Amino acid sequence: MDKHTDDRKKNNHWKAEDRKSAATEASETRSGGNYAKELARLQEEIAHLQAWVKKTGARIVIVFEGRDAAGKGGVIKRITERVSPRVFRVVALPAPTDREKTQIYMQRYIQQFPAAGEVVIFDRSWYNRPGVERVMGFCSEKKAKRFLEIAPRFEAAMIESGIVLLKYFLDVSEEEQDRRFRQRINDPLRQWKLSPMDVESYRRWWDYTRAYDEMIRMTDTDDAPWWIVPSDNKKQARVNCIAHILSSIPYERVKFEDPDLGKRQKRPADFEGDTRRRTVPNLF
């Protein structure tokens, strides 16, 4: 077993008292009072995680699944907005091409897996098969059932290879999803988020409920468990989820070295600036 995987249950820098503090402050985000403060604290810790990942060559995969409008994109944005996209890479694959449809189902996801020193975040993943593909009839019931049998073995192989795998399902109530969908309809800046597929998923709430229940039941294992994130409160969901990620990875803080800028070179005596450059108008 890879060291990164073998150490998962050991204490790391994000200690129990930190998790308790995160949970306490998360409860206060209902009023929004401490959200910015807590998020900043968590994002600073993510920067330490990034340094550790780069130093040790760790490989991490974080899967986000969930209801439409549950806030997956919002959580992912808060994880990645203060770190390097060269280390934290977000994968949101479109519908498979005709060529990809002829490949092994997992193949296009495997191609996105991390190299040493990378964290790959899947904004929806191979779990499209027992979710949207199954409910919408894009795959047969036989293929969906077969996927549910294979997925735990596939993920066991990932972990055996040294990948740290975390799986999160963002859950939102019927009432809150309804409110968010109607908010999108009435807001020109959010209408683009409401696709025909979203509308269809709204209508098939209970079909999705059955599919997701079986998906989680069949693919929740001790090595690759599903973690449910209650998401009716977006801010609370974000800080709870980020705190859990930090508590689940056995990273250690890496000392940041202050860079020495040295002296900047002097302007050459023979340098003449190019006065023909086009400059954006100063309107503000």
Curated annotation (Swiss-Prot):
Which Pfam families did the record assign?
PPK2
Protein's GO biological process = ATP biosynthetic process
The Basic and acidic residues compositionally biased stretches are 1-22, 260-277
Q: What does this protein do?
A: Uses inorganic polyphosphate (polyP) as a donor to convert ADP to ATP. Can also convert GDP to GTP, with lower efficiency.
- This protein's source sits in the domain of life called Bacteria
Q: Which family does the UniProt entry place this protein in?
A: Belongs to the polyphosphate kinase 2 (PPK2) family. Class I subfamily.
Q: Which reaction equations make up its catalytic activity?
A: [phosphate](n) + ATP = [phosphate](n+1) + ADP; [phosphate](n) + GTP = [phosphate](n+1) + GDP
Q: Would you tell me the protein name for this molecule?
A: ADP-polyphosphate phosphotransferase 3
Query: Any idea which GO molecular function terms this record carries?
Result: polyphosphate kinase activity
Check the UniProt entry and state the signal peptide residues, or none: none
User: Which SUPFAM superfamilies does the record associate with it?
Assistant: P-loop containing nucleoside triphosphate hydrolases
Which portions of the sequence form the region Disordered?
1-32, 260-284
